[in-house]
Amino acid sequence: KSNELLAHAYSKLYGIPCTGLRFFTVYGPCGRPDMAYFGFTNKMVKGEKIQLFNYGDMYRDFTYIDDIVKGVSAVMEKAPDANEDGVRVKVYNIGNHQPVSLKFFVETLEKCLRKAGVIDNEAEKEFLPMQPGDVYQTYADVSELEKDFGFKPDTPLEVGLTAFAEWYAGYYRRK
């Protein structure tokens, strides 16, 4: 939030047009190893237990990396128009706008990893209560992105996770 306020101040003071982007739970090939889906994958490969909080009933808006790239490309085509205060600042959410439960996500990931030959075992899951401070649901409202640029992310979860699983299989077989 502070970066959005700073962008607003710079735009107002110096006339610099600023566009902010909020990414929602990005996943895909070559992803960050500290993200949950990567951690789940590594645990499945090692046969370790996966912990699912709120008994797997937490919802996240998982967004495939190609959709993020397309969204960034679309937004780069045009600086924001001035708002009612004359400030040229706009913030867009880039997310799949279809949150799924963590339980469903892990089950789909497991299926894709099995199909790609990464695992052949059943993932062991531990269902735990909600952690203090955790958020039950996050999702992206992409209506402004769609209105201004005619774009909204649309990669189905299974398609994106299949691409990740195939990449993971190829990358880690070489190591």
Residue ranges and their predicted role:
Residues 42-175:
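C-terminal substrate-binding subdomain of Rossmann-fold SDR/epimerase-dehydratase oxidoreductases
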Residues 1-4, 31-38, 62, 99:
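Short-chain dehydrogenase/reductase
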Residues 16-36, 58-59:
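Flexible, glycine-rich beta-alpha linker
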Residues 9, 31, 37, 69-70:
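Hydrophobic alpha-helical membrane-insertion segments
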Residues 1-19, 41, 45-46:
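Active-site Tyr-X1-5-Lys
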